[in-house]
Design a protein with these regions (language model features):
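Active-site microenvironments that recognize anionic phosphate/pyrophosphate groups
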Residues: 1-116
């Protein structure tokens, strides 16, 4: 049997991608420009699955019960380095990400219409 190993062309080593909506200084899908962030960056998701409406609709009959939920969907960019993943980060930078997660949880849980 003859086997040939082929390498696929991936962007794993690309530090900056001009076409990436998450990279620093790039425009996102909604036209907002990201800042030139140097660390963990958080923003509200441009196309969130939930919105922050306070009115609630309830549907209730014998078979089905449903109600609307409000919320905020946030995006956390771990690093300005396009190729960086949590698995490749050092402990200091992983700690920064975890700290941001904690802060986001605390901030969002203070909002009256968030049920996290």
């Amino acid at each position: 049997m003859i086997c040939k190993e082929e390498k696929t062309d991936t962007n794993d080593s690309v530090i900056y991608d001009a076409n990436c909506y998450l990279c620093p200084n790039n425009k996102r899908a909604n036209g907002i420009k990201n800042p030139d962030y140097k660390d963990v960056f958080v923003f509200d998701n441009d196309f969130a699955a939930l919105n922050n409406l306070t009115n609630q609709n309830i549907y209730d009959n014998d078979l089905l019960q449903a109600k609307t939920e409000s919320g905020i969907c946030r995006v956390v960019c771990f690093s300005p380095d396009h190729s960086m993943s949590l698995a490749n980060m050092d402990v200091v930078n992983i700690s920064k990400v975890v700290s941001v997660w904690k802060t986001q949880y605390e901030e969002l849980s203070e909002l009256p219409n968030i049920n996290y």
